[in-house]
């Protein structure tokens, strides 16, 4: 059925409270108290106000221990902490701030404190300018390397993310039309003007303590009238004599050989030449990091 109305709304006064009304309400409560019945209080105090209006006027403006004015930094921190844990339960927050009303705290949050919090979380205005300036001041060679690598990185449209080096190798060998390049550390890339090479890095073995990185190099070696397709695998690793590590390398090599046998020499040439027509330079790792080489001939 719903709650019964606290008063006859047709015969009560609405709008701002006058100083005379404030004086009547304050004088009555100081002498008689609330009596626990706010519905009957307006009639006893001689006010044409609703009981709810009298209660809010007393709690938010007229009670003697109420505090008005600016909030301190300590109060701000308490409001931040409680708001993060319980949300906008202003009456509960007001219970932790002596002399503050839930109405004052709510108004203070909406008008000042929330804006102050947002301003502290926003990045400084010169942040984006600094990023743009540092990007434009990069050397032309570094910028060209960055653009080339971005344009040649393997991309999987179904998952909307870059492929791992091992996935990139498999997709290239399965008939992709574009050449795939991958490099984890851009500082290790330099130009090599002598040959057109396809360099791909293998996936780092996370289960091993030693660093195990590799690349696949496909090159054309012409000797007299004969042309030999050479697959060179360059191993760069810290020496590890563990037998399990050795067997893992042999499995990797045999898998690559099976994939390569499915493609003829002309198909491999076409894959290499299609990616190198726009530039005669190729990417190569720092030779100082190469420890040993293994040659597989086909």
Curated annotation (Swiss-Prot):
The keyword Methyltransferase belongs to this UniProt entry's keyword annotation: no
Q: Which PROSITE patterns would you find in this protein's record?
A: HTH_MYB (PS51294)
Tissue-level expression reads: Ubiquitous, with higher levels in roots, flowers, and shoot tips. Found in all cells of the shoot tips.
In this entry, the residue ranges of the DNA-binding region are 38-62, 90-113
Cellular compartment(s): Nucleus
* Molecular function terms, GO-annotated: DNA binding; DNA-binding transcription factor activity
Stored Pfam families: Myb_DNA-binding
> Where's it mainly located?
nucleus
What is the recorded function of this protein according to its Swiss-Prot or TrEMBL entry?
A: Transcription activator. Positively regulates axillary meristems (AMs) formation and development, especially during inflorescence.
- What this protein is called in its record is Transcription factor RAX2
Gene (name only): RAX2
